[in-house]
Amino acid sequence: MEVYTMRRFRWMGMLLGVAILLGACSSKKLSESDQLLVDYLVQDYQTYFDFPLVLNDFSATVQKEGELIDQETNEPIYEGDRVTLIRGSEPKDNEVVRVTCEYKEGDLNGIFVEIHSEPTEYSEESLEQLAVAFLSEHDIAKQVSLIDQKVKENEREIIFRFKTEQNTVIKVYVNQDLKQAVGFFKTDGEDL
């Protein structure tokens, strides 16, 4: 009975979040298929992260696969449909700035949460352990080996690139200041 009640409250909370998102998140009316992608983003965000998110503060954008083309290569920039929630106001410390999901053929290909944070000291080894634990806790991958890691200039996330037991590559983003995983992305391994 207790498990049923917890599931019911979680489901009701998710529906409330979607309802708020429908009513207040975007000033422009989304198509039915775009709204479905936004609903998926909210569900996936709640599955992987517990950072507070007040949906009234965000607007939604949807970019369908193939809409954005790289001018140099004439190839699509994204592998799937990309959905983004963007905060409309100035964030405070540790508040979500943006949530981006990519869906490839209807399946979640990756999710990333950008959080406003102040610089702190960290150990790259401990952050790698956080990335591995995140993959395991969310049943994304049980066994991984580190390929490499990178900190992009002027960004607070370290990107760890892992090879899985199925020989796929997953990038995990760990915020150095929060010492928490803030995203993952399944990739062919060519880019970091």
Label each region the model flagged.
Residues Y4-M12:
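Bacterial N-terminal signal peptides that target proteins for export
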Residues V96-K150, L192:
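Long, charged/polar, surface-exposed segments that mediate recognition or autoinhibition
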Residues L21-A24:
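C-terminal motif of bacterial Sec signal peptides marking the signal peptidase cleavage site
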Residues L53-E102, L146-D177, F185-D191:
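Exposed beta-strand-loop-beta-strand "reactive/processing" segments of non-cytosolic proteins
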Residues S33-P52:
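Post-signal peptide N-terminal segment of mature Sec-exported envelope proteins
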Residues G17-V18:
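Hydrophobic membrane-insertion alpha-helices, especially the h-region
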Residues Y45, F49, V62, L135-D139:
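Sec/Tat-exported extracytoplasmic proteins
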Residues S26-K28:
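Bacterial signal peptide processing site
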